[in-house]
């Protein structure tokens, strides 16, 4: 599942955002080093926790605190990380491999098309992978930008087809799925954003995309063509950066969660 700022995800998900403040030059190097280590640990925890609700995390922290108290010691970051991982059932090998491929596809296309930064990826869940992506501010909302956005949304499915030759239902099946979001955006491009191939000056509001696409076969065809083009573009990007993509898949599969810095260490040579 793709989480990003312009299209909101489930309201009960908890996202931890850390501010990188590189201007604390008034403090000594030891303090800065300690704060950097703390920030790195928190980023790791935030990445591990993607997909959990606030109530889930509250329960994890409470149980970790009780465990530390019983052992008469202080609570550590490792306790919380262990609690997060213990909260989730073990994901089968083949499913975890598919998750890693899918999320790496999103990440490689997001980075290659310069949509913004990557805060983290995780496949340490039993309900699909999760990623935290941000988008550069101040970019014009042109048809080209929306085309890149669609390519990123279709990239998980494209990656599965490239590597596994089959696709799972993970990119669809829910209101906040990749396919659902991509369909809504492509429909907006046709009817509400002024990019349509027919009557582009009309603003046609639609509260039920399923209903309107089911009734209008021609509109459904135009929307589907946009999605096909986006998937083809994502496929091309992944092939062009196949070496970096393969490295990211392996690293994500092994670690099960990577923060943004770890992802960029892998993708940076392709910038």
Model-derived segments and their meaning:
Residues 13-21, 25-51, 78-91:
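Short conserved motifs of the RecA-like P-loop NTPase core
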Residues 4, 8, 68-71, 157, ...:
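A general structural signal marking secondary-structure boundaries and capping sites
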Residues 18, 94-101, 107-271:
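Soluble catalytic regions of large protease machineries
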